[in-house]
């Protein structure tokens, strides 16, 4: 798949939070402008859509708050005892299924309620599978998840 005639990576994830993420918002760069946010509401029907992760309060910062989210609802920045943390790095470090989460204090535990699975960029495997079940072709599915990109034969590129 290409964007402006250039071969590009096409990221995928298991299950979005109902909308995929915009590359420019995530990477703050025009180079990833080809990754457009699209609705993938069918993902919300998956049995794996919501996931709870419980972590003992003792191992977390005393103050932990979401500072910023992107347009798809994924946490991009958190404040941890006054320090700014990047959302996706926090997700990976804490073993969360998604950076689209809410934080709840429950007794001596902190509950992270996560929507979706993975980074949420590009192709949703669950959403793509559901589109295929509805007789959409591979080309139609890729065009849906990568609307600004073009499918080209490799011989056309090189």
Language model features: what each stretch is:
Residues 1-158:
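Conserved, single-site charged/polar hotspot
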């Amino acid at each position: 798949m290409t964007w402006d005639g250039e071969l590009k990576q096409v990221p995928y994830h298991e299950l979005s939070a109902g909308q995929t993420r915009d590359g420019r918002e995530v990477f703050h760069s025009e180079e990833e402008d080809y990754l457009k946010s699209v609705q993938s509401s069918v993902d919300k029907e998956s049995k794996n859509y919501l996931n709870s992760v419980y972590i003992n309060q003792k191992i977390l910062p005393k103050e932990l708050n979401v500072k910023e989210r992107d347009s798809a609802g994924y946490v991009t920045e958190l404040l941890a005892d006054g320090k700014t943390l990047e959302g996706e790095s926090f997700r990976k470090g804490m073993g969360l299924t998604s950076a689209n989460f809410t934080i709840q204090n429950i007794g001596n535990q902190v509950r992270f309620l996560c929507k979706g699975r993975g980074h949420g960029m590009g192709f949703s495997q669950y959403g793509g599978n559901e589109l295929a079940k509805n007789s959409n072709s591979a080309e139609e599915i890729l065009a849906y998840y990568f609307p600004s990109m073009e499918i080209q034969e490799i011989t056309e590129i090189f």
